[in-house]
């Protein structure tokens, strides 16, 4: 009986410690220049901090897209999150300028922000692609 209990305890311990490990994938694009610096994922401090925050967070998936204003040539970032809340898929996003100033956002299940905020943020901007993606398998 002691052997059975010991075996069960070992199996339980192994299950607990290996079952808590989360499998994830990370895509980072370091071969770009934006906001006046090479590799903004590393060299723009607030963006580097945001990437680390995303890796430690609970979002099922997060992407950072690089945008460029076709008139001013300024860059901006759109960070989108996909997560579960009470069993439902939820989405949110935040738009930032190069300094890390929040300019626009949206949230699933909440009152939408005024449409003019979205229009103002995306006006004259083109997407240059995803530069960071984090997702759980």
For every predicted segment, state its role.
Residues 29-42:
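Post-signal peptide N-terminal segment of mature Sec-exported envelope proteins
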Residues 21-23:
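Bacterial signal peptide processing site
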Residues 16-19:
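C-terminal motif of bacterial Sec signal peptides marking the signal peptidase cleavage site
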Residues 1-4:
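Positively charged n-region of N-terminal signal peptides that target proteins for export
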Residues 11-12:
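Repetitive helical segments and hydrophobic/amphipathic motifs
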Residues 27-30, 104-108:
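Long, leucine- and charge-enriched amphipathic alpha-helices
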Residues 105-137:
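C-terminal partner/receptor-binding element of secreted or periplasmic proteins
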Residues 46-101:
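Mature extracytoplasmic domains of secretory-pathway proteins
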